[in-house]
């Protein structure tokens, strides 16, 4: 049998509750917790819940595929690493494009070769 752990996104369930209460409820149900953004949350309060946090967004601004904003991804990833350490998170998610309220800030319908190369250089 393979050991695995199920995690629930605290951003997607029990949305009528404050984030701390969502985390408590998920933890009480026996699941690990995921969060998206961390900059708008009380990290010390989240850590004090005793929940196990498994992943979170690993940057705050910028697009991996945009040469004008890709440096923002790297700069804010450094901040995200420090935040992740507070929660014991070992996995950070990077998306090709910045998210605002869970949606792409600058939606693009098709990736070009130049976009792929920019993402490669950024990473």
Segments the model singles out, each with a brief description of its role:
Residues 1-3, 21-28, 40-58, 78-88, ...:
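Acidic (Asp/Glu)-rich catalytic clusters
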Residues 13-18, 32-45, 62-71, 100-103:
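Acidic-and-aromatic substrate-binding clefts and catalytic sites of carbohydrate-active enzymes
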Residues 6-8, 27-29, 64-66, 108-111:
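A short, structure-level motif marking secondary-structure boundaries and short turns
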Residues 4-22:
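Short, Lys/Arg-rich amphipathic segments at extreme N-termini
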Residues 4-10, 31-35, 53-58, 92-94:
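Hydrophobic faces of well-ordered beta-strands that scaffold small-molecule active sites
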Residues 66-123:
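Active-site acidic/histidine proton-transfer and metal-coordination neighborhood
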């Amino acid at each position: 049998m393979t050991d695995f752990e199920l995690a629930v996104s605290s951003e997607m369930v029990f949305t009528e509750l404050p984030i701390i209460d969502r985390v408590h409820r998920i933890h009480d149900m026996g699941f690990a917790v995921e969060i998206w953004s961390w900059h708008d949350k009380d990290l010390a309060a989240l850590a004090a819940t005793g929940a196990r946090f498994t992943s979170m967004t690993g940057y705050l601004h910028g697009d991996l595929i945009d040469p004008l904003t890709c440096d923002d991804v790297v700069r804010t990833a450094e901040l995200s690493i420090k935040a992740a350490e507070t929660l014991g998170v070992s996995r950070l998610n990077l998306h090709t494009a910045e998210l605002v309220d869970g949606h792409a800030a600058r939606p693009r319908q098709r990736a070009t070769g130049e976009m792929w190369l920019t993402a490669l250089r950024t990473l």
